[in-house]
Amino acid sequence: MGKSKKNRAAATNQLKHKSQTSAEAFSFGDPVPVLDRRELLDYVECVQTDRWYEPPVSFDGLARTFRAAVHHSSPIAVKCNILTSTYIPHPLLSQQAFSRFVQDYLVFGNAYLEKRTNRFGEVIALEPALAKYTRRGLDLDTYWFVQYGMTTQPYQFTKGSIFHLLEPDINQEIYGLPGYLSAIPSALLNESATLFRRKYYINGSHAGFIMYMTDAAQNQEDVNNLRNAMKSAKGPGNFRNLFMYSPNGKKDGLQIIPLSEVAAKDEFLNIKNVSRDDMMAAHRVPPQMMGIMPNNVRGVWGCGKSEFSVCEERINTLTEKDAGIK
């Protein structure tokens, strides 16, 4: 009997020892950049695929990001429109073709013009090739159009028929990269905030608050009537108010918790404003030219000399680069 008590005491001590040593504190969830793994590709520059080089950044991703946020696509449209307005149409290059050429350059950091000739070797037109699907060959003198489809396969452009305008990169010299890459996370954050708020309003299947009842004076019939009233208040965009009469009820027996207080914690306006400022800093276009209204009533509605000079300097730089077409 004494031996069993000793064993029981030893087992109890062992359980206490395990309970004392099993407690463990650790941290997790440290923020990690989602693009840090891509830095490994900088060691190999552009990846060789089949008969051409792939760009260091996904052009398909840049195309989808173009319309992710209004403050990202608007400055690109401003620059494209200004450059197109300064262009003098040429018999070989129409104004619409030049606009496509400029847009590809601003979005992808690369723009291509294909020289098309007749059977006699005479140039009949200069047509922009879609930068999203144009790749540079392994010898760097040839170009490929790599759009796959039901009836299309990659084909090689005639050697010497492609003019390539690129925005220089610091890691490789095969492709160009746009200057707004640092603002892409802000553009995606801006889009996510807008979609989150939009889903909140579309959902709308609530009465706008939580009713918390602890009053014992209520009978089951009153509770059922209140439940039916809450159910009838549901519906898209239905924010109704309810009235309840509770004689001899407690002060805190019925509590109303508005859902708007919970929704206000997502910092929607701050996220939109901060991400907007990041995109504007990357594109360097005055807010007046992007159609942004000033926050204060006394704000300047027109584009001042300083803002216009900054934009004009940027446009002149792009114009000088496009002059290489001639």
Curated annotation (Swiss-Prot):
Keywords associated with the record: Transposable element
Bias (Polar residues) ranges: 10-24
Domain of life: Bacteria
UniProt xrefs under InterPro entries: PBSX_Proteobac (IPR030935), Phage/GTA_portal (IPR006944), Phage_portal_PBSX (IPR006430)
Region (Disordered): 1-24
Pfam families assigned: Phage_portal
Claim: Transferase is one of the keywords in the record: no
Family indicated by similarity: Belongs to the phage portal family. PBSX subfamily.
UniProt-recorded name of the protein: Protein ORF5 in retron Ec67
